[in-house]
Amino acid sequence: VSTLLYRIGRVAYRRAWLVLVSWVLLLAAALGGGLALGGQTEEAFSIPGTESQEALDQLEQLFPAAAGASAQAVVVAPDGASVTDPGIRAEIDDLAADLSRIDGVRSVLGPFDEFADGQVSDDEGVAIVQVQLEGTSEEVDDTTLEALIATGDDRDARVEFAGQVFQDTTVGLTVSEVIGVLVAAAVLIVTFGSLAAAGMPLVTALIGVGIVMGGILALAAVMPVSSSAPLLALMIGLAVGIDYALFIVSRHRTQLARGMDPAESAAVAVGTAGSAVVFAGLTVIIALLGLLVVGIPFLSVMGVGAAFAVLVAIAGAVTLLPALLGIWGARLVPRAGSRAWRRAQREAEHARTMGRRWVRGVMKRPVLTTIAVVVVLGTLSIPTFSLDLNLPDGGSEPAGSTQREAYDLIAGAFGPGTAGPLLVTADITQTTDILDDLDGIRSELADVDGVASVSRGIPSPGLELAIFRVAPVTAPDDPATKTVVAELRDAAAGIESEFGTPLSITGTTAVGIDISTRLTNALVPFALIVMGLSVLLLMAVFRSVLVPVKAALGFLLTVGTGLGVSVAVFQWGWGAELLHTEAGPILSFMPIILMAVLFGLAMDYEVFLVSGMREEFVRTGDPRSAIEDGFAHGARVVTAAALIMFFVFAAFVPEGSNLIKPIALGLAVGIAVDAFVLRMTLGPAIMTLLGRAAWWLPRSLDRAMPDLDVEGEQLRDHREHVVWASQQGDAVVVADRLQLQATDAVLSLRAQAGDRVALVADAATRRLAGATLAGYLPALGGRAVVAGAVLPSEAGRASRRVSLVDVGGDRLTVSTTAGELVRERLALAPRAARRGRGGPGARSTDRWLERLATLAERHGASSGPISAADLVAALPAHSRALLLAAVGTLDGTPILVLDAPDGALAPGEVDAIDEVVRALAGDGVVRVWGVAPGSADGLDPADELALLLDTALSTTEAFR
């Protein structure tokens, strides 16, 4: 992975303007598309498979007038007056008439109409006008809402409007978010001591979140998207976008201060720090996509949107950022004697830095440190046990808004439960006395404990359903309301048996309770799945069992602390006024979102810190010095990254939406605790106690897991091999003690352009050697350069420069003709290789076979002409070998590896066929012939030296 990222970084650096323009065009396309499609977010929470949602769906089909969007105009009489006073009553009737004339209004029910029920408060100070709208909440346009609100202007009585349609679902930024970005910029400037270096992470992050915002707006045009989704994606995209770029720029600046070439430094920074970024980002994505397992659509969209933001941040860090580094070039090199330059020198010399002093203090008292951290964080987690979950309603709207004012007026005048009534649907298809049965059902519902009032049953036009509005005594977000819903559902069975009318409990409040229950039940499975997958990924990254387990268990303390502080502030009300909020239940999906995001981000710091420790342990084998040195190298940049994330998240708390505030506070606290207390304090303490056991991994697991090379060991080897390859002069192929798989054979050879080389070994070893030179099999050791491609790190390039030819034709089907073989190879050959030979048609095939016959005759390799219709398998061994070897030249590669079948060709025949191959391929092509031991006798002595040491054969054969 590190080598691949190194190449990506190098290409992006060299083609900086192309990469930058591509990203800017992508940003313009995303934002333009999102705005053009006009997507709007919404707060339509739904949860398929629950009783409340199924009842709503049934209501929408059978009683659309009751299932559509609705609003309430709340009229408050002036002080000392009553809504029943003639003047106020006339004004209410006039208001109802004005409302009924608005486009998009289906019906209006005034408080004094014949079928009105409970729309005037007991003290007659407040009245409600019910407004039924056409379509769902998402389908009601702003023009209709503005017209509704305008009807309340210039009246003697105060008029406020309530209803889900008035909830603010716009996505906007406030001054506090801008301040958060400015504080992040200040941290970057202090970290780098350079405006240019500090600006690059901000640029990549802002471009990334712009693309994400455009994508989410476009998505909102075709499917429901919660208003929290873009805010969550924005918050996470900014945080990880800045952090990921920070790690790479920090590595780049350190390398520049130590004298590395800027282009090479950018590529190396992307290959090393970028590897940690990629795998840290993958853990975040895994955690966020884990929200899909919960099975709640709006939550799945939030998870996918946030995961997309992380993916874009990763892509920006490894492509856009090196392009910016390329544009700035050598101007980013710290001046000699500057703070950045001195810091880089101190790190190289293992000087006493703040990070080194801190970790030494932790390592001196690991037991005391562990106990202290667990006790403190455990105490902060205590409020989590009183967690109360619910969905937002009118009471969570901003203070002073018309929907919040109306909600408070209804709750105060009619009772808290009236502000969020339950809907009870009754199937009346089997009843014969509808009105009496509805009265009986109403009476039974009113007798349920906790019910304040029940409206008269209203049958649907087709007499399939009837609905009752049930107002609990308590508010929608009161825990007692959950008990009322449960008791209503328990009572439904008895009512059904008495009246033959199945009942369902639904409505916004019931849906919210069902969602909260589903989310609470999903927390443990979600945590197990996400933690399990991430532990497996970290096991592959760190090659350890205990380190990933330690990281996952520490995460539980992080989540507990984040949730505990959020409960204390938003549920208990501690310091709520400082954050411009009020005490109430916690947003029902906040804990699972917090778990997903915090887990991913917590693993970020684990990867960034522990990968440095792993790198030092691999280099030195000393676990204590690995902890100290690895921590010292990563502490400064992790500190800066954590501070940036903290300030970005904290910026959404004071003036953010009520939906996002508790999430933002939980994330800000969780990030600070995780980075500074868990990863930088508890982590080194536990690693010290574990010692060498921290890096234990069973051999079976080690063999089964892929080598992800986060530490960049393979990249270091690759760079060393590139330097070695540059020292090989004009050699086309050089193999330096390549250890072949599944054998003890070691291959060493050197060939100039036009050389012929013989590999002398048994058939199996020859094939292994050919596949290794062509990059298809990795060598167990050694190094090689094949036509400019370094092995083993550039196996893909090597495979395009080498053609493997089995001149025995053992793998051909019996029915393959010579013409089919040539046409197939011509069709697959690169365009440059086909130049002058025509396309893969019959005429070009015949011409090529004629040329082959001419060359074979000239070099004494002919045993008769070969026609296009001849079956290859039926040709004599010599003719078949000639044809197959010649066909191998059609690939146009600079190296041919040809394997001669044991005993099928005499040395003189190999010489003759080789001359034909050289004539077809060109004098500069290297031909590597694989022959059996003893078959080299009599070969042309002009051949270059080939040396194959094969301990299985216990022989060394060399020839010239």
Name each model feature, range by range.
Residues 808, 813-859, 884:
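Q-loop/switch helix immediately C-terminal to the Walker
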Residues 865-868, 877-897:
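GG-anchored amphipathic helix commonly corresponding to the ABC/SMC/Rad50 NBD signature/C-loop
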Residues 743, 753-778:
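Glycine-rich P-loop/Walker A and Walker A-like loops and their local beta1-loop-alpha1 context
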Residues 1-39, 105, 136-389, 500, ...:
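Membrane-embedded transmembrane helical bundles of large multi-pass transporters/channels
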Residues 283, 892, 904-940:
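Conserved catalytic loops of ABC-family nucleotide-binding domains
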Residues 727-742:
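Conserved N-terminal strand/loop that marks the beginning of ABC ATPase nucleotide-binding domains
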Residues 779-791, 798:
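Conserved ABC transporter NBD signature motif
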Residues 49-70, 79-163, 386-572:
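Structured non-transmembrane domains adjacent to transmembrane bundles in polytopic membrane proteins
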